[in-house]
């Protein structure tokens, strides 16, 4: 993990070994928020990209690096105090030896909605399409 104690993996589930639903909990006390931003903490976009890559590494049990990002949309701000729990859906497909096609969509529970799995409303904070390559380390 590049950022020690930045997040905790809560669960990782897959019905088919291609699409995964990952749940993580952010640490709102992490030192990164002292500079980004002290009174109104926001998860830096680059940290979201790193978190997604680390989840893919855990799934594939290998070190990976981004080699192409064809589309990355940050759709809403993630405040680690108000919405510490994130859900990320990852789709990982082998496209050639050592390369994976990654599609990711991250969501948070909308503030003020009922916190049950069936009725809670979600807000998308990132949509990503990229290629990850094994570093063979």
Please give the residue ranges for each predicted region.
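Catalytic strand-loop segment that frames the active site of acyl-thioester-processing enzymes
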Residues: 1-43
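Intrinsic-disorder/low-complexity, polar/charged segments enriched in Ser/Thr/Lys/Arg/Asp/Glu/Gln
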Residues: 17-21, 47, 85-87, 127
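HotDog/MaoC-like acyl-thioester-processing domains
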Residues: 19, 91-137
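Generic structural detector for well-ordered beta-strands
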Residues: 23-25, 73, 131-133
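Intrinsically disordered, low-complexity acidic/polar segments
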Residues: 31-33, 81, 97-99
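Surface-exposed loop/turn and secondary-structure junction residues enriched for glycine/proline
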Residues: 35-36, 40, 46, 75-77, ...
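Acidic, aromatic-enriched beta-alpha/helix-loop junctions
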Residues: 38-59
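Hydrophobic beta-strand-centered segment that forms part of the acyl-chain substrate-binding groove
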Residues: 53-91, 96, 123-129
């Amino acid at each position: 993990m590049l950022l020690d104690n930045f997040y905790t993996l809560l669960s990782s589930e897959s019905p088919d070994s291609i699409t995964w639903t990952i749940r993580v909990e952010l640490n709102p006390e992490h030192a990164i928020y002292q500079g980004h931003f002290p009174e109104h903490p926001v998860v830096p976009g680059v940290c979201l990209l790193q978190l997604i890559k680390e989840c893919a590494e855990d799934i594939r049990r290998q070190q990976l690096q981004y080699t192409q990002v064809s589309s990355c949309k940050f759709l809403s701000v993630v405040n680690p105090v108000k919405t510490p729990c994130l859900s990320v859906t990852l789709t990982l497909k082998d496209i050639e030896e050592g390369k994976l096609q990654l599609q990711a969509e991250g969501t948070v529970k909308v503030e003020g909605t009922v916190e049950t799995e069936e009725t809670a409303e979600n807000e998308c904070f990132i949509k990503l399409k990229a290629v990850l390559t094994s570093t063979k380390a």
